[in-house]
Amino acid sequence: PDPKKSQQWNRGAYLVEGLGHCGACHTPKNFAGADDSGSALHGGNLQSWFAPDLGPDLRVGLGHWSADDIAEYLKTGRNRFSNATGPMSEVVQYSTSKLTDDDLHAIAAYLKDLPTKGQGGGDNTKPSVDANVASAGKAIFGDQCAECHGADGSGEPTFFPPLKGNNNVQQSDPTTVVRVILEGARSVPTKARPTPLSMPAFGWKLTDAQVAA
């Protein structure tokens, strides 16, 4: 325990660093497969999924998420920014959705106090994009994605996650985004959100170049 921190923070640290072992996915690994402690909880690729940065970065981290947003996501699998998918959906279904509200807010308090890391799963620099590729991507998005996620990518929070400003979309590692496009996604039922939502797979109809665009 850190005597300089609150009881809530210390409880959150225990749940995140110990019992919850969040770093197993969200901390990058070195060449030997061990955690890169200098980048703890700032994004990692594991089992062909990219677990995003949990730090305060506004582009790729949780900088825009409030403590209540974090608690809601862990309890229900959804919030106004994102829906849990992949391995994280199992974490929510079998673990965090069972926690007390006090424990969920303790986790949130700890995560909101994480230090900034310049390069975790992404950076603050908006990447340059070829104009022709961007134009093609816009057309494909309009045909295949806009009906649910909106023409401007704003989505319908807690149902169809917004893609504009989405920290998963803005990671420098696109693994999760590409995988969801190819394979689709399905949210998990929780007590608070008992009806799961699903996104269809597009791997059968889009080429690699179209997915990249």
Q: Residue spans of the language-model regions?
A:
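Sequence/structural segment immediately N-terminal to covalent heme-attachment motifs in c-type
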Residues: 4-30, 35-43, 129-158, 165-183
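Post-cleavage N-terminal segment of exported redox proteins
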Residues: 1-6, 47-52, 68-135
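Flexible internal linker/loop segments at domain or repeat junctions
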Residues: 121-134, 155-157, 187-192, 196
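Active-site substrate-binding loop specific to GH73 endo-beta-N-acetylglucosaminidase modules
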Residues: 27-81
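An acidic site on a long C-lobe helix of protein kinase domains
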Residues: 8, 18-21, 66, 100-103, ...
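Axial heme c-ligation environment in periplasmic c-type cytochrome domains
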Residues: 49-62, 76-102, 158-163, 186-213
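An amphipathic alpha-helix signature
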Residues: 67-71, 75, 105-108, 174, ...
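Sec-exported extracytoplasmic/periplasmic mature domains
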Residues: 17-21, 27, 75-79, 97, ...
